[in-house]
């Protein structure tokens, strides 16, 4: 009888332990920081899209028959000419601009094997975004001199933007070594109006199957309300993209007033190539990528420019 009680209690503890270990995989929330900077790819260049900082919180919905993820984000983006110190307007080949915004996003995954993400963004473009202060702070950290030329920046304008992203995997099942997913993004508003389409290629560096697109760090979808068989992830990804732009207020200025000291016309067709490495294990997501993009205006001499992106995220139960 004692042996029976021992084995009974041992079995219960074992079952409970297994249950708890699987329950720990149901991470429902995530906080993260994304940092863009051209210094992540070169210690020499400091120009054009020179810095972006994004802080976010996202969580998985309760009591939903389909997977839904909500996100709140605060972001700041900074743009400068080729030379951060421009004493004369003739030296400005791309307007100085700063954009500060808050954004809400809603992502859901359909049983019909596609995902849809919608977003609403409110912000301010211009001196009120405090980009000059932010750049001087970054320069102080890196030991660079303070910048001049922000008196030529895009004037203040209110930002309201809506976004829609459609995700579609090429396959319904997980592939072991490589898979492909297409995304199409529409941005419509006073700051950016453009349409982009791309293809993500994931190349697995583990021997296990890739997580599905609806449960992967690449698509910001690895949050769940119930325990899953989610595995750690380590993969290389490549994303070629083509787009068509109708409006870019960081270059053209406001849609409603023409008081910016320097503005340029934009190139309608835009191209981009991103490649990098992503790693996700238990509570942590880490990634590094390089983004090469075509010039947004013909005033810029260089046809291709580059910046790097670093992401750090932490999951909560």
Language-model regions: role of each:
Residues 41, 82-83, 206-317:
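Outer membrane beta-barrel transmembrane domains
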Residues 31-33, 72-74, 104, 118-122, ...:
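Membrane-embedded beta-strand positions of outer-membrane beta-barrel proteins
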Residues 52-54, 101-103, 159-163, 196-200, ...:
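Membrane-embedded beta-strand positions in outer-membrane beta-barrel channels/transporters
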Residues 76-103, 107-217, 222-225, 247-265, ...:
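Outer-membrane pore/translocation modules
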Residues 1-28, 314-316:
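Bacterial Sec-dependent N-terminal signal peptides
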Residues 31-41, 178-188, 262, 288-294:
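Transmembrane beta-strand segments that form the barrel wall of outer-membrane beta-barrel proteins
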Residues 26-69:
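N-terminal ordered "arm"
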Residues 25-31, 66-70, 114-118, 174-184, ...:
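Outer-envelope beta-barrel architecture signal
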């Amino acid at each position: 009888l004692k042996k029976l009680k021992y084995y009974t209690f041992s079995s219960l503890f074992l079952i409970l332990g297994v249950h708890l270990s699987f329950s720990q995989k149901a991470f429902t929330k995530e906080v993260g920081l994304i940092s863009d900077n051209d210094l992540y790819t070169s210690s020499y260049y400091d120009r054009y899209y020179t810095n972006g900082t994004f802080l976010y919180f996202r969580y998985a919905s309760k009591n939903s028959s389909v997977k839904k993820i909500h996100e709140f984000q605060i972001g700041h983006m900074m743009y400068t000419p080729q030379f951060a110190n421009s004493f004369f307007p003739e030296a400005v080949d791309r307007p100085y601009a700063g954009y500060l915004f808050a954004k809400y996003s809603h992502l859901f995954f359909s049983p019909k094997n596609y995902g849809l993400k919608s977003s609403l963004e409110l912000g301010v473009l211009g001196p009120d975004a405090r980009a000059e202060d932010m750049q001087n702070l970054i320069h102080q950290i890196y030991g660079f001199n303070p910048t001049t030329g922000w008196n030529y920046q895009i004037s203040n304008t209110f930002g309201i933007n809506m976004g829609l992203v459609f995700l579609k995997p090429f396959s319904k099942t997980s592939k072991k070594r490589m898979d492909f997913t297409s995304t199409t993004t529409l941005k419509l508003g006073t700051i950016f109006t453009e349409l982009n389409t791309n293809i993500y290629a994931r190349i697995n560096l583990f021997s296990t199957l890739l997580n599905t697109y609806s449960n992967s760090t690449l698509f910001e979808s690895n949050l769940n309300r119930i325990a899953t068989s989610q595995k750690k992830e380590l993969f290389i990804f490549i994303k070629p993209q083509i787009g068509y732009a109708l409006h870019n207020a960081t270059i053209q200025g406001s849609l409603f007033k023409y008081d910016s000291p320097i503005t340029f016309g934009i190139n309608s067709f835009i191209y981009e190539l991103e490649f990098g490495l992503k790693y996700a294990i238990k509570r942590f997501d880490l990634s590094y990528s390089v983004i090469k993009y075509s010039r947004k205006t013909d005033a810029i001499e260089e046809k291709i420019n580059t910046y790097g992106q670093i992401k750090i995220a932490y999951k909560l139960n």
